């Protein structure tokens, strides 16, 4: 197949005001720019088919209607692939969450700079490219899986090998194994041996035996006095729905965020929203520390706060400030984590934590 992209490479932002685009839409009876894109992809497919080729496109080609013989590469989750399969088309599952090997595979500060994210070996191995809800007659339309390695941050072949191996071994086993027979502990033991074999052959795989793993507390809950307590958000402090981390209880569930803001464990505040939360301890409580972790990754515009204020109250109305921290945000290419906290002795029922965005 010949793959054609139709997202960043052919953005549609200018099409509504493009005279040529509008003229073509009118001539072909197309109601919107998505249908114009579909018209374009269909014409390309006809050309490719006439030359003995098949068209394979990223899941954006679903917008406006699929070309008759197209295969869909599902990268924004598996939903695009499922839509293709449901309409009788072939699909290749390649979701970013499991198949983008340009993400960090271990603690970012232990690895060469990467594009971001966190995709360890175990996460790759956990991928199921054929959802359980897929009917038996549709399974054959899932053509396979694909790993992707974009090389903006990969300057050498040796670096590329490190990003590929051993994660590609995990994806290969995902592709040929029924989920019922997969066993990560067994695979991990075999992967350790394969890494040594690859080294002996002159390759440069990731040093799996010295893997650090996820952030402490990201996989196993930690205990503290505020776990399970009610959290109230200020009127101008709503978190962004796309980064809810599980909702209003996320900041007191005992589970911290991992190495990536995309792991659904970090709450994000955008636009004019700021973090302003009050925790109700239910009764006057001795408090010795209050803190919250923040992440900064400048590329996708995830920044530290410029100021944090921690205060307490017994009535939920009048608060006494315990600590105010100013922070100079340094914009660089690193993935950094900082805990802004207070330690001391206080007694209160309500704890308020505020930040101001950089």
What are these regions (language model features)?
Residues 149, 235, 294, 355-357:
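Residues that line or immediately flank small-molecule/substrate-binding pockets and catalytic motifs
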Residues 48, 72, 168, 290, ...:
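Hydrophobic, well-ordered secondary-structure elements that form the walls
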Residues 1-5, 356-358:
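Short, small-residue-biased leader/transition segments that mark boundaries at the very start
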Residues 32-36, 160, 302:
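Extracytoplasmic/periplasmic, Sec-exported soluble proteins
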Residues 270-274, 297-357:
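Trp- and acidic/polar-enriched beta-sheet ligand-binding modules for extracellular glycan
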Residues 215-287, 295-304, 324-334:
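Disordered, acidic Ser/Thr/Pro-rich linker "stalks" and the adjacent N-terminal cap
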Residues 54-58, 65-70, 76-221:
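Flexible, acidic glycine-rich loops studded with aromatic residues
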Residues 3-70, 75-83:
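Active-site neighborhood of glycoside hydrolase catalytic domains
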